[in-house]
From Swiss-Prot:
It comes from Mycobacterium tuberculosis (strain ATCC 25618 / H37Rv). Belongs to the arsA ATPase family. Pfam families: ArsA_ATPase, ArsA_HSP20. GO terms for molecular function: ATP binding; ATP hydrolysis activity. The lineage of its organism: Bacteria, Bacillati, Actinomycetota, Actinomycetes, Mycobacteriales. InterPro entries: Anion-transp_ATPase-like_dom (IPR025723), ArsA_HSP20-like (IPR040612), ATPase_ArsA/GET3 (IPR016300), HSP20-like_chaperone (IPR008978), P-loop_NTPase (IPR027417). This is Protein Rv2184c.
Length: 420
């Protein structure tokens, strides 16, 4: 609840990871535990595979109407919460949103002919379904019906594309048709006015999404991995990508970890393949975790055991996290936060420095660019537009270097615009 007594906007928890690591299971388990702790929780699937209902053990049919299924509810008088589930049908979302937009714009601009474009034709536009799914999650959080929205995202590549599209779309729309030009379109140019109004609506929506995603108080990512080398390598890259995008990582969950009894000597085993396999897998998993520590540091981990039975249904899911243990350590790498200071000099002889922490990014993929008042940072297939501090907007770039995961860009004043 907020100070005014009205429900606060729900926190959004994004469960991200490689396909098959157990995102749906751990997202559902987290939602079940939060509901049991008295919270009003909604778990949402944006993955078109939609295995959420399979994990929860109930039917959760995909829908574009935003009508959730009640999974469980505890006694509210005893402080219990409830859990709802929703599988987003982004194709149905697209159809509903497009028909609403056409109806609204047709009233303002009769004869626009937007109604001649079928929603099915828009499906070919890259990323439109992902953006609509993310927009729907934002609307659900703003509805204040729940305290927490747990999002079961698609596999890593699709999830990262979903998270980067709002900022990317806004960037290219502004470059292709700047806002001041769009707003100067006269009413006599009906077709251009319709297009300008449509883009303005989209721009406002994606701008709100970009702002929401980088609000660490409301949005966080939960990175799920298994103790396997290929999966761990992708998780490390994902950490860097999320940091570059400005999304706060709340925790790393290592799923399907074989339980090891410290009081048992695993080297003295009966001569049977099952025992040898178990001991070898434990050793491999331990080696993967050691390599992970060497790469990202002693980061806190949630260690989820590999159970004999598949956890399906609220009771089993709640027990899964009850059996997990937390390994203490440092917080995951934080999102990109620019730090600006004066390195030396004064006036036109000043040298200013912009520092950005870029953890777990491949230096060979790092490129920089500048567009007006923004610094464009690209790495590992991701791109982030960083608004420069006011003092740096009147400067030109002197040089840049990357050392130990920290990017330093130096600036010198531009005599043509520097105040005298």
């Amino acid at each position: 609840m907020s100070d005014s007594g009205t429900p606060a906007q729900a926190r959004i928890s994004l469960f991200v990871g490689k396909g098959g690591v157990g995102k749906s299971t751990l997202a559902s388990a987290t939602a079940v535990c939060d509901a049991g702790a008295g919270q009003r929780v909604l778990v949402v699937s944006t993955d078109q595979a939609h295995s959420l209902g399979d994990v929860l053990g109930i039917a959760v049919p995909p829908t574009g109407q935003g009508d959730p299924v009640r999974v469980l509810a505890y006694d509210p008088e005893a402080g219990g919460g409830f859990l709802d589930a929703l599988a987003l049908d982004t194709l149905a979302l697209l159809e509903g949103r497009w028909l609403h937009v056409v109806e609204t714009l047709d009233r303002r601009f009769p004869g626009s002919e937007l109604s001649s474009i079928a929603p099915e034709e828009l499906c070919a536009l890259p990323g439109i379904q992902e953006v609509l799914g993310l927009h729907a999650v934002g609307e659900l959080a703003a509805a204040r019906r729940w305290d927490r929205i747990v999002v079961d995202c698609a596999s890593t590549a699709d999830a990262l594309r979903m998270l980067t599209l709002p900022a990317t779309f806004g960037l290219y729309v502004e470059r292709a048709w700047p806002r001041h030009r769009r707003l100067s379109i006269g009413a006599d140019d009906g077709r251009s006015a319709v297009l300008a109004e449509l883009l303005e609506r989209i721009r406002a929506s994606v701008e709100r999404l970009s702002t929401l995603l980088t609000d660490g108080a409301l949005v966080s990512a939960h990175l799920v991995l298994t103790p396997e080398r290929v999966v761990a390598a992708e998780a490390v890259r994902t950490l860097g990508s999320l940091a570059l995008m400005g999304v706060r990582v709340e925790e790393l969950l290592v799923n399907q970890l074989l339980v090891q009894d410290e009081n048992y000597e695993y080297r003295s085993l009966p001569d049977h393949p099952a025992f040898h396999w178990y001991a070898e897998r434990i050793g491999e998993q331990r080696a993967v975790l050691d390599d992970l520590d060497a790469t990202i540091g002693d980061v806190a981990l949630v260690l989820v055991p590999h159970l004999a039975g598949e956890p399906i249904g609220p009771k089993a899911l709640g027990g899964l996290l009850d059996s997990a243990r937390r390994r203490q350590g440092s917080a995951p790498p934080g999102p990109l936060q620019p730090i600006v200071d004066l390195e030396s000099g004064s006036g036109l002889a000043s040298i200013y420095r912009l520092r950005l922490a870029l953890p777990q990014l491949d230096p060979g993929t790092l490129t920089l660019g500048r567009a007006d008042d923004d610094l464009i940072v690209s790495a590992g297939g991701m791109r982030r537009r960083v608004r420069l501090a006011s003092v740096l907007r009147r400067c030109t770039v002197l040089d840049a270097h990357l050392r130990g995961g920290e990017l330093t860009v130096r600036f010198r004043p531009n005599p043509e615009v520097w105040p005298t």
